[in-house]
Amino acid sequence: MIVLKTLQFTKLTATALIITLALAMSFLVVEPILSLAIEDQFTITQSVTAEISFLTAATDITMSPTIAGLTGGTSNGQTQVIVNTNNAAGYTMTIVASSSPAMQGNTGGGSIPNYTPASASIPDYTFAVGANTGEFGYSVSASTTSDLAQKFLDNTTTCNTGSADTGTLTSCWYALSTTATSTINRTTATAASGATTTIFFRVQITANPAPAIPQATYTATTTLTATAT
């Protein structure tokens, strides 16, 4: 009887072991399927628009010194703007006068004639006014020379050619117009500190202008427009 019970116990033990092993094998087969990772990939999109602003806007200018109406003289002034844009294609800037001639007398109806370059569409490298007259003109300089519109670039002797900005205050003089004139053509975004443009103005009256330029205070109202391209 002892031997029989031992055999029965052994069979039971073996059966239990087989069942346990079977369950373990089932777990090994099923569990990897249950524990595999799955992925769900997606994107988040945010659009950022281009903007442009004046970090520093142009200020009003008082030309200096005053000019004697008969003996004549030369007067200068300047203003500066700083433009900031994140537009990858950069920006353009134009200048336009509100009247023609641009420099109008505040009283009496007089005016100072616009500058007359030797070629109607090309600035003069030097500011030159003929005898017995007076004229008002402007020039443009940029902190990044390549930003300048081509007509304000020079080859050290002639404007609208070359890639230099020679002499700044002494080069590439042009006449204000009631038609917008391109001054800046930048092709990249600016740094956070912006891009600087300086505009110089000059009035020169030669001796005994004819017709006479009446005694008055003269004002030219101009507008700069910067546009993201």
Each language-model region and where it sits:
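Sec-dependent, cleavable N-terminal signal peptides
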Residues: 1-39
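Signature of Gram-negative chaperone-usher
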Residues: 31-229
